[in-house]
């Protein structure tokens, strides 16, 4: 059986002006009673309006016609009402409907919603999928929901300023408002359109972004300023404006990271503080009691030269719960975070247990954690440990290959065991979290000294430890010991 809606008297009264009202109204919250059974499903067919391909650089009208009701199976004489118009599933927009059922929207609002939907001001043709929530009231007064099709149109935002080949600078309270004090932003290594400035400031500050072409010695061409459409914008994440640009406010002090995306024309301001140490405690470690005890707070290893990132190999029993902290005590601690990949959740059965990170599947895991400001990432991966270098499967010609993997024990007190060395030479061992490139394996390497696992962490090259053909490495991550024999 199909469904229809029976509307209240208040909704019926509204229909008299909804079909022909030219004012821009936002009817995103229709009033209705619960649906009841109906003998048939009524439909509405919509088509794109005459303004189905909008280019903002060429547009001159204040409003545009984006859709039209072309037909309906509602009873003849029914009055049609539209309750909401939604773009790309999540964005409602004010609209008007003419007497011949043409839907009009303000062009400026449509442009703004398009940019918000794609989080971008880039002058790229964007598809907008329009869903129209429509109803019919029959001559007998019955209100029935209409099922309609989706309509697609396109909009291309206005052209943004060209990327300055010489980059961008920050000028503001914490630099000084002159050209000589401007601080250059660094181009991101992976995104040629992303520019970054890391700074440490004493108090919240206003700033603007300038292309290099705007700075000539101590002089600044203020007409080229980039900022926010709202002066003093402290949102931390918004679009960049190039006309009448207002100042952006950091809303933070201390270590901050300012980013400017010169393609999408967005900025971010983030807390850039990061711990130099990280510890894990939990149900298997007496929940951090006593403070400072290495058996209650398990230290993770820094990823060499990589701010705020750590790793460790740990055994978890089923349903163990853990938290992390930047010291071997409570304070600024965290457990389950949103930035855990589905792959990690599936591998280890990870879940949120009252804010704690719960591990549902017992076993050994390589745990990778990144903490920079409020941005926290936790990943659980297979505990792959590799033999590297002279003694490995094919020396330096084959790295991080299956033939160099250590075996993984099935118990918490078991040993990881390497393949037998194929020749004499310096022994090198590493893990390789997915966030660390294969070529940077040395950032997560370690060796054995005097029967103990010695992690490189943020240190330099470790002293060479020699191995002989046929020997193996034995590692006990549970108690931190190891041997070569």
From Swiss-Prot:
GO terms for cellular component: cell outer membrane; outer membrane. D-glucose binds at residues 173, 206-208, 231. Residues 384-485 are annotated as: Carbohydrate binding module (CBM) 3. GO terms for biological process: starch catabolic process; starch metabolic process. Pathway: Glycan degradation; starch degradation. Changing residue 396 to A: Abolished binding to starch. CDD domains: CBM-Eb_CBM-Fb (cd12965), CBM-Ec_CBM-Fc (cd12966), CBM-Fa (cd12964). Residues 1-19 form the signal peptide. Pfam families: SusF_N, SusF_SusE. One of its GO terms (molecular function) is starch binding. Belongs to the SusF family. This is Outer membrane protein SusF. It comes from Bacteroides thetaiotaomicron (strain ATCC 29148 / DSM 2079 / JCM 5827 / CCUG 10774 / NCTC 10582 / VPI-5482 / E50).
């Amino acid at each position: 059986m199909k469904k229809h809606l029976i509307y209240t008297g208040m909704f019926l009264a509204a229909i008299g002006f909804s079909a022909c009202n030219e004012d821009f109204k936002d009817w995103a919250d229709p009033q209705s009673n619960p649906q009841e059974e109906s003998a048939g499903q009524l439909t509405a067919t919509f088509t794109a309006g005459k303004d189905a391909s909008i280019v903002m650089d060429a547009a001159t009208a204040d409003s545009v016609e984006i859709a039209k009701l072309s037909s309906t199976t509602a009873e003849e004489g029914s009055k049609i009402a539209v309750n909401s118009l939604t773009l790309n599933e999540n964005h409602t927009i004010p609209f008007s409907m003419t007497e011949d059922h043409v839907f009009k929207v303000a062009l400026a609002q449509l442009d703004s919603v398009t940019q918000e939907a794609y989080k971008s001001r880039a002058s790229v043709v964007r598809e907008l999928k329009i869903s129209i929530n429509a109803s019919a009231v029959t001559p007998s007064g019955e209100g029935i929901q209409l099922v309609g099709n989706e309509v697609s149109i396109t909009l291309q935002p206005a052209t943004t300023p060209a990327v300055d080949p010489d980059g961008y600078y920050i000028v503001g309270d914490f630099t000084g408002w002159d050209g000589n004090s401007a601080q250059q932003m660094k181009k991101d290594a992976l995104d040629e359109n992303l520019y970054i400035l890391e700074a440490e400031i004493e108090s919240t500050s206003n700033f603007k972004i300038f292309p290099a072409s705007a700075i000539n010695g101590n002089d600044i061409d203020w007409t080229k300023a980039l900022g926010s459409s709202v002066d003093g914008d402290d949102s931390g994440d918004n679009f960049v404006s190039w006309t009448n640009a207002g100042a952006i406010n950091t809303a933070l002090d201390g270590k901050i990271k300012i980013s400017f995306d010169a393609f999408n024309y967005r900025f971010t301001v983030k807390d850039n503080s990061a711990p130099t140490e990280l510890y894990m405690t939990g149900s298997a470690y007496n929940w951090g009691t006593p403070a400072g005890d290495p058996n209650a707070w398990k230290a993770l290893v820094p990823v060499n030269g990589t701010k705020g990132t750590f790793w460790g190999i740990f055994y978890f029993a089923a349903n163990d719960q853990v938290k992390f902290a930047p010291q071997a005590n409570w304070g600024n601690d965290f457990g389950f975070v949103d930035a855990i990949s589905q792959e990690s959740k599936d591998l280890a059965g990870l879940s949120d247990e009252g804010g704690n990170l719960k591990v549902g599947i017992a076993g050994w895991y390589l745990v990778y954690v990144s903490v920079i400001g409020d941005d926290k990432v936790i990943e659980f991966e297979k505990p792959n440990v590799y033999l590297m270098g002279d003694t490995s499967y094919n020396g330096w010609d084959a790295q991080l290959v299956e033939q160099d993997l250590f075996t993984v024990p099935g118990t918490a007190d078991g040993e990881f065991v390497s393949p037998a060395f194929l020749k004499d030479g310096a022994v090198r061992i590493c893990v390789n979290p997915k966030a660390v490139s294969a070529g940077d394996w040395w950032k997560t390497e370690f060796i054995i000294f005097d029967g103990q696992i010695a992690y490189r962490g943020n240190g330099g090259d470790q002293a060479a430890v020699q191995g002989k053909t046929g020997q193996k490495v034995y590692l006990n991550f549970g108690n931190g010991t190891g041997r070569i024999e």
